[in-house]
Structures are given as structure tokens and as C-alpha cells.
Regions:
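Conserved glycine-rich cofactor-binding loop
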Residues: 11-12
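Catalytic Tyr-X3-Lys loop
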Residues: 81, 88-110, 126, 143, ...
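Active-site loop-to-helix junction immediately N-terminal to the catalytic Tyr of the SDR YXXXK motif
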Residues: 90, 136-144, 156, 241
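Alpha-helical segment proximal to the catalytic Tyr-Lys
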Residues: 115, 158-163
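Residue(s) in the substrate-gating loop at a strand-loop-helix junction
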Residues: 130
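Short C-terminal tail/terminal secondary-structure segment
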Residues: 135, 224-241
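Short, small/polar-rich loop/turn modules that mediate ligand/substrate recognition or access, typified
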Residues: 162-166, 223-225
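C-terminal helical subdomain
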Residues: 169, 188-219, 223, 230-232
Length: 241
């Protein structure tokens, strides 16, 4: 059945791949992004509507929900930031910005969309956490904290909104998108990080989009409150002893 899906971060790597997959399956999309030219081009390709702005701008989140329409079946929050610094270099502003962009704005987006999500017979929300929320990585203190909060938000809202709205999160390991480019643009470094995964490669946006589309679909109507690793086995397996 065709669903109306609101996608935040639609011009990002994972957001775009998710939008393309959902559109190919006949869903109707409302896209949210910061860059008018890229957003307009994607919306035109996918026959979607869109809202352009910064998620932290006053009044922008309620505006995106008004623009999306009265009934929303799916919400994807694929906005994210990454601040990789040692603790002594992290500023108060770094912590607050990562927390607001990754966690608080996700909560506010779901809050604003609640009346529209409640009008859907099978509403579902997909958030993006990170492997760094459950595994300790150096230089990740700020983003790990923010994604840890997002994982907890997933559980809390899944409980609060059941059985009307399902809430799940995907926790990627290193995925080749613009966000993480500094970690994979050097071939030697990319291969070395790929080798840390039991399935020895880096993630792709399509790996994430496949699970996001499944979690939004009617094939997943008994799945809620889950934080699912898409990480080549890195968070759970030790294959080399
Ligand atoms: N890539 C990875 O290795 C990785 C690992 C773990 C978790 N994740 C999570 O996966 C999700 C998708 O990220 P991605 O890898 O696809 O990264 P991406 O390509 O950089 O996409 C992130 C999107 O967030 C948008 N964004 C950032 N700050 C914003 C703001 N203040 N207002 C509005 N939009 C904003 C960016 O907009 P612009 O296009 O305008 O910059 C971009 O579209 C994020 O939640 C990220 O934290 C990614």
C-alpha cells in the first residue's frame, strides 16, 4: 500500500538512498533538507514535495509537518552530525550542537508529527543511532553521547506510542557518505577500518536504506523498540579470537 513518508536529511547519503528506495516502491514522499537546489532536484526526480531549512531554525519543524500533509504514515530522521575530537578539545557548543541535531530535534520532529502519525493505521518511525552508542570509540565522546540519547529515545517512545506508532532505530557502523568522508577518503585508512568488520567492507547508504524501508513497511508491523545494527557484524562478533 502506498504510504506518505516524511524524510529528514533527504539530501544526505542515507536519506537520499532511503527516499529513492521508498519512491521506487510507490510511496509518496515529503523531503526535508537544507540545500534548495539539491532538494528541488531530488524532489522533482521522485515526484515528491519538500521543505527547505535548518532543523535548528525556530518554527521550522512544525512547518515541515504542515507542509507534509494531514496524515503521515512514516517518519525517517536521517539528519546527523559528527564531531570527532578528544575530550580536551571538545567545547560546550560542540556537545550541545551534536545533542540538538541528533537527539533533541528528532524528538521534536516526532512530537510535531504525532497528530498526523496518529491518523495512519500503521505509522512507523525510523531513527539513526550509531555503533558508537553501544561500543566505546576514542574521539567520539560528543556524538556517542548524542546517539546514546537517541537510542534511549527510541525505546521510550516505542513504549509510549505502542500500539499506534512503531519506533525503531538503525545503528550503522562506518558508512560511506559525506558525513564520514574524513574517515574513509584515504584508501589505506578505509581498508584498515573495513578489516575491523567480520564482513570486511564499509557500509553503503543502500545497506541502511534497505532496512529503513523494511521497518516502515507492513512487513514489519510487529517490530518496535529495536535498535538494529547494520554494521557487518562489528558490534556483536569476534571472528579472530
Ligand atoms: N555515515 C556514517 O558512517 C554513519 C554512522 C553512524 C550513524 N550515521 C547516521 O546516519 C544518519 C544519516 O547520515 P549520513 O551518513 O547519510 O550523513 P550525510 O550524508 O551527511 O547526511 C546527513 C544529513 O543531515 C543533514 N543535516 C545536518 N545538520 C542539519 C541541520 N542542522 N539542519 C538540517 N539538516 C541537517 C545534512 O544536510 P546537508 O545535506 O544540507 O549537509 C545531510 O543531509 C545520521 O543520523 C548519522 O548520524 C551515519
Amino acid at each position: 500500500m502506498s504510504k506518505k513518508v516524511l524524510i529528514y536529511g533527504a539530501t544526505g547519503g542515507i536519506g537520499t538512498a532511503t527516499a529513492k528506495k521508498l519512491a521506487a516502491r510507490g510511496n509518496r514522499l515529503h523531503l526535508v533538507g537544507r540545500h534548495a537546489d539539491r532538494l528541488e532536484a531530488l524532489a522533482s526526480d521522485l515526484n515528491a514535495t519538500f521543505s527547505c531549512g535548518d532543523i535548528l531554525s525556530e518554527g521550522f519543524i512544525p512547518q515541515t509537518v504542515r507542509d507534509a500533509g494531514e496524515c503521515i504514515d512514516g517518519l525517517v530522521y536521517a539528519i546527523g552530525s559528527i564531531t570527532l575530537k578528544g575530550l580536551s578539545r571538545l567545547t560546550h557548543a560542540d556537545f550541545i550542537r551534536d545533542y540538538e541535531v541528533n537527539a533533541v530535534s528528532a524528538a521534536l520532529a516526532i512530537q510535531a508529527a504525532l497528530p498526523a502519525l496518529k491518523k495512519s493505521p500503521h505509522a512507523a518511525v525510523v531513527l539513526f543511532s550509531s555503533i558508537a552508542a553501544s561500543q566505546g570509540f576514542g574521539m567520539h565522546a560528543s556524538i556517542a553521547m548524542a546517539k546514546g540519547a537517541l537510542s534511549s529515545l527510541t525505546l521510550s517512545l516505542a513504549a509510549e506510542l505502542a500500539p499506534t506508532i512503531r519506533v525503531n532505530a538503525i545503528a550503522p557502523s562506518l558508512t560511506q557518505t559525506p558525513l564520514s568522508q574524513s574517515l574513509w577518503q584515504n584508501e589505506t585508512m578505509a581498508q584498515s577500518i573495513a578489516g575491523l568488520h567480520p564482513i570486511s567492507r564499509l557500509g553503503s547508504s543502500e545497506d541502511m536504506a534497505g532496512l529503513a524501508a523494511f521497518l516502515l513497511s507492513d512487513e514489519a508491523t510487529w517490530i518496535t523498540g529495536q535498535i538494529m545494527g547494520v554494521d557487518g557484524g562489528r558490534s556483536t562478533l569476534r571472528v579472530k579470537g
